[in-house]
Amino acid sequence: MATAVAAKEEPATRFAKDQLKAIIERIERLEEEKKTLSDDIRDVYAEAKGNGYDVKALRTIVRMRKQDANERAEQETILETYMQALGML
């Protein structure tokens, strides 16, 4: 008798299982898309390198373009201050 009750799931339990499964599948799909995008980005950098561009400089520019102007200016000021302190400027 206990197995008959266990075999029949409550609707709320079934809903929770279905919802959990859907969430996991979405995460897996997004992880796969993220991997594909990462591969595509790596290919673009490889193409740029093949065309003679400095990949390290490109990565720096991409990172800097993500920052707002004030944040970027502050970071550049700090870098310049450190470089002056080290006699590099």
Curated annotation (Swiss-Prot):
Domain of life: Bacteria
InterPro entries: GapR-like, GapR-like_DNA-bd
Cystine crosslinks: none
Short name of one Pfam family: GapR_DNA-bd
UniProt GO molecular function: DNA binding
Family designation: Belongs to the UPF0335 family.
Protein's UniProt name: UPF0335 protein Nham_1221
